[in-house]
Amino acid sequence: MGPPEGIAIVSASLSPLASFGLRRGKEHQGGSCHDGRMSRVTCDLTVSLDGFVAGPNQRAEEPLGDGGELLHRWMFEDPEANAPEIEGILAAGAFIMGRNMFAGPGPSVWDKGWRGWWGDEPPYHAPVFVLTHHQHEPLEMEGGTSFHFVTDGIESALARAREAAGDRDVAIAGGAQTARQFLSAGLMDELRLHIAPMILGGGERLLDGVGDVKLEQAEVRGTGLVTHVRYLVVR
């Protein structure tokens, strides 16, 4: 079975959410309303049973490391059973990602005209704010995606993403380091873990070093290839 309509896997670095290649269909363009409240900050990540979001030996050819792509079987082999979670991933009105997710592991390739992993029409169809230490002009892509490069920290990126998202959610798209930064800083409202029944044995862990973060389990749902656990961040 192929990927669900509106979803395309991409070769993006470090975060399993990056590999989802979030592709939002036309039915999502209107957004959703949160009754006038400030948009939530969410993060969807697939992890192995031993807590890794990517396997060992991450490299340009295998940005999710050895075995990392297998984490995401649930999206592409059983999309119908996992439709609510896929819908949740697609709902964001703006995204934030780290430099490694945009450019991949290893030396920067921006000076070579790099425009991301996703071709001329990236799958986000919304503004994407890329955290970096290097100045870069915005990139306007086909299909509504635009990349904006933020050099003054996660708070600035979040403020800009909230403004762009309006009443829709802001999604932390990855990678793992970026997710940890937002979680540790108390800037995340929901952490949605998709736990794959596999052991990677090494690679990049998600939660190492996040500090004293309190989570409240809000929902658990299993579909065979994955167990979805939604946590609220308690402040």
Language-model features: locations:
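Enzymes that bind and transform nitrogen-containing heteroaromatic metabolites
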Residues: 24, 28-235
